[in-house]
């Protein structure tokens, strides 16, 4: 099969924290398109989150450092604006459940009507369908095991935030 020129795609999210499901979507996007801009988004209308924006960027960079063709940057505003700034041909979104599709499809139609950018959906691996940043934060807060859900740098950062171990034998969540 002849290789096609690489395309750039934008993978936006709050990534609070970046987890293995996110990493899987980035890996799939690199394989399919060649270049991925992980857009760590700041939404001034939402609470600032557990992890400060600059640290979320750093954790995503550490988590994707082994992948070629990946750039991680912080963006504010709309994902379609970030896509334009990044020179992205598409926005990539990961899907875990039918509910994710319903929400993302509305956003995709809106984004396309605003700028013409299209959204590509990538399914998460079945063994990661249960992973969410919200659940990871809650489990980490109570000292539960998260090392199988997040890259090591993220587990360490959350252990530092909550002052509790993140991957020992404390029992399951």
Predicted regions and their residues:
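Nucleotidyltransferase catalytic core that binds NTPs
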Residues: 1-173
